Amino acid sequence: IRCRVNDPFYMNTTSILAIEDGTVVGRIEYHFYGCMQDGYRMTYVDWVYVLPEYRHKGIAQGLFKKMEKDCNKHKMNQYYLIRATNPNADRFYKHFEDVELSECPILRKEIK
């Protein structure tokens, strides 16, 4: 990951780390983008992860709250992510307030 830190391509990405006793125990990564035509501003959450032994302690919720503060600071209209499809993730996201959960198919192609 060090080689990406100074790569201009990744400069619009933000990572917030949860650190306990000097150890990174969780991370959320996101970036902002918008539509020039209508000025709508969105945040895409690329990555959310908390080490298994630190889950169910409010760490992921705290990461999302910090991200939402950053979104408010930058006047973002909404954020979205592609949810993991596992029981733990489903339970976690169902506790969010004022969100729309949907089942959306995803097409992905690796560029070679």
Regions found by a protein language model. Name each.
Residues I1-S15:
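Active-site rim helix/loop that mediates acceptor-substrate recognition in acyltransferases
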Residues S15-L17, T23-F32, Y44, Y49:
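Conserved beta-strand in the GNAT
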Residues Y33, L51, A84:
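Residue-level recognition of the GNAT/N-acetyltransferase active site
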Residues Y33-V45, R55, L101-E103:
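A conserved beta-turn-beta hairpin within the catalytic core of GNAT-like acetyltransferases
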Residues V50, H56-K69, H95:
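Conserved acetyl-CoA-binding loop-helix of GNAT-fold acetyltransferases
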Residues F64, C71-A84:
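Conserved GNAT acetyl-CoA-binding A-motif
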Residues Y80-D90, R108-I111:
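Conserved beta-strand-loop-alpha-helix junction that forms the acyl-donor binding cleft
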Residues Y93-C104:
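Conserved acetyl-CoA-binding loop of GNAT-fold acetyltransferases
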